[in-house]
Amino acid sequence: MAGLRRTLEARLVDAIVLAPHPSLMEELARLRSRLPAMPIVGYAPFRADDGELMAECERQALTTLAIEGVDDAVIGDLVVRCSLTTVRRHALADGPRMLRLVERLQRRAWDLLVRDVERPMRTLDLACQLEVSREHLSRQFGAGGAPNLKRVIDLTRVACAAQLLQNPGYRITTVVRVLHFASSSHLAGTVRRIANVAPSALGGLGPRGVLVAFARGNTRSRV
């Protein structure tokens, strides 16, 4: 578990996969209390006589269980379906409608931005993934009353920060580190522009709340 704690402090983790064992249950309980919104998948060669262990996994609110040797072919899909990215995508499902992203290019860009939040997406990199020029992407993304691309990039990253901060185990300094903000003040300024709140209020908003706050009046840069 020490290695897992170090990873959580250093990188954006989308889900935790571990092999439950009776000796780990106490530490797993502490982990779950710190990270109640983090998907945790139990993956082990469970046997018929492991009923008590599986019941303890349920008590510790593991997201799902998979049986090693039986579910091997689908474990990747199981993890993706319960990952933070998938949960965040569902929370932001109304984003295209609320932000007037009606064109195919706008929606394709949105899908990539919701997924790739660990680092600030460069417009050129996004354009390359979409196989268009940087200029075309910047011009077309903001068409039809949609927000400009830079603000939507910030929106998706602030939504992820809000998702992480729903967990008591994530401090603001940790979120700054794992999402590669330059500093705590950089995060605070971005959060203020996008959601008009302090970072300490993000956990209460969650990703959906960030989207709603943004759509209510923060879609355009202030002069």
Residue ranges and their predicted role:
Residues 95-120, 129, 152-170:
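A short, Lys/Arg-enriched amphipathic alpha-helix from helix-turn-helix/homeodomain DNA-binding modules
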Residues 123-152, 178-198:
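Basic/polar phosphate-binding segments, predominantly the helix-turn-helix DNA-binding elements
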